[in-house]
């Protein structure tokens, strides 16, 4: 196990995530207990993947929410890895799991262990009795942990749970898109969390910003229309946020 993976394992313990369960809502966990502010915004499929920086002493992670949610979650975990590994400012145009750059390798290993912990993977495989994973195993594993099939297969390879020849064959099938058809046939439903919820809004500001804006509405300092403009949502969404306390999450 690398130092980055051990740090991720320790971080799961610190965040109260245990050593095997999926992360139910990564954004809320990291904003509540990870000490970072996270902003999501649509930048297009070819836009910046994510960045990490500290602004006025506050760690900020900005993520392109245009890609599929499984990619967005990994990018969030990757940027959080830069934060916890002390890498300083990081600007990632793409998240390349095959990168050999030292910082990128560390952030990728951290993200993979945070989202799909080795202990959990082993126990999950044993519960299924899969001696050698096939495409269905990879699809179900990815779905269980809310990651992509590429990440799930990479974890199986990293932890030596799949033979090289089998991995290459599975990689080719994933690149051909067969996993998507299989997921549909198996009736696998996507993880519902802040990432999937906020995609329809286009922009998600950090919780601390949303709290400040809604508090200003409650105090009569600004009206609903102004709040909607500052939060990049419509007035109906502002009403829903106030009613359900979403700015506090």
Regions found by a protein language model. Give the residues of each.
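Active-site hotspot residues in diverse enzymes, especially metal/ion-binding acidic/histidine motifs
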Residues: 1-249
């Amino acid at each position: 196990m690398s130092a980055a993976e051990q740090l991720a394992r320790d971080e799961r313990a610190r965040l109260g995530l245990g050593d095997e369960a999926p992360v139910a809502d990564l954004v809320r966990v990291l904003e509540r207990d990870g000490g970072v502010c996270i902003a999501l915004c649509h930048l297009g499929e070819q836009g910046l993947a994510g960045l990490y920086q500290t602004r006025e002493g506050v760690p900020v992670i900005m993520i392109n929410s245009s890609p599929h949610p499984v990619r967005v979650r990994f990018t969030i975990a990757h940027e959080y890895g830069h934060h916890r590994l002390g890498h300083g400012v990081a600007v990632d145009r793409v998240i390349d799991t095959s990168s050999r750059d030292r910082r990128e390798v560390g952030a990728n290993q951290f993200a993979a262990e945070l989202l799909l912990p080795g202990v959990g993977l082993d126990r999950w495989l044993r519960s299924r009795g899969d001696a050698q994973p096939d495409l269905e195993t990879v699809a179900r594993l990815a779905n269980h942990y809310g990651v992509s099939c590429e990440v799930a297969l990479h974890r199986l390879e990293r932890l030596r749970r799949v033979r090289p020849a089998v991995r290459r064959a599975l990689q080719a099938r994933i690149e051909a898109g067969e996993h998507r058809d299989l997921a549909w046939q198996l009736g696998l439903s996507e993880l519902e969390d802040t990432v999937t919820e906020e995609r329809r809004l286009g922009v998600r500001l950090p919780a601390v910003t949303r709290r400040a804006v809604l508090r200003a509405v409650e105090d009569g300092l600004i009206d609903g229309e102004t709040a909607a403009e500052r939060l990049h949502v419509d007035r109906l969404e502002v009403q829903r946020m106030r009613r359900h306390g979403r700015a506090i999450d």
